[in-house]
Every structure is written in C-alpha cells, then in structure tokens.
Amino acid sequence: MSENPAHKDLDSLQVDEKAKSWIAEKVEEELRRLESVGAKAIPLDVKNYSVMLDEDTDTVVNRIELMTSFDFDHVQQILLSAVQPYPYDKNLMFVYLVILTPLPHPMLIPYLFAPKVVGKNLLPRADGLVENTLKRWTFINDKLKRSDTVVREFQEIEEEATK
C-alpha cells in the first residue's frame, strides 16, 4: 500500500485499554438506543485511528483501520453523530460514524480524534492549527484495501421532541 507523500501521519492513536473499555461501553449504549427506536446497526471493530495532514492542501484526513473485509469503496453515505468530549484526554473528541452501503443494515464505527492539528500554515491562522472538519476519510480494511472518501456537505438533523 503506497501512501501519498503529501500526507503526514500526525497522530497514530493506538487505543489503550481505558479507551477501549470506554468506547465499547459507548457503542453498546448506542446499539441499545438504536434498538429502542426500532433501528439496527452493525458495529465494526477498530484496529487504530489516526489523523493525517495533507500538506498540499493543509487539510486533515481521518484514517481508520478496521477489522473487517468490507470494501469501503461501496460506501454510499456517511452520517456523523454529535461530537462528544472524551473524558480521559481533553485533546480528543469522540463521534460515531454511521456508514450506509448497499447492505441492509448500516455500519457503526466509533471514532476518537484530535479536533485540531498543527498545520503548515498555508492559510493564515492565529493559532497555527488546522481544524479537523471530519470531511476527509481514509478507511483501511483487514485486507489492507484503502478507500478514500470526502463528505461534500453536512446537514443538521434535529431530534423531534417526545410528546
């Protein structure tokens, strides 16, 4: 697998036992919530997370290695949950990815990430940090098949209040 030399791997996050336990608890919580509203998702196990800086564009690429043989070239849509703080490290945040494919049930991927990374300052920023917009994704399956995806737009969806 060849990496784009313009992509600099900034933070390869090997998930420690505390994080694994917390993430597993969050995934179980989300699966119960989905089941309570009549929905189902297939949770995917993650090998590791990292954020990379594309030095050509000074943008962040979110990279996830997953324990699945699924070919992520078949992703039709990525939905993101609201971003949540990660309680054990103030520099990290947590979000769920809901991956829609031709398969009958969506996939649920937990994602722990850095919301900002040090950039090359191609664009003027007071703090020198590049915001992680969660728009660029690289998925790698257990066959080392790499799939790159870009989220073109975000739409806010508000939960309807229960009467």
Curated annotation (Swiss-Prot):
One of its GO terms (cellular component) is cytosol. This is Uncharacterized protein C354.04. It comes from Schizosaccharomyces pombe (strain 972 / ATCC 24843).
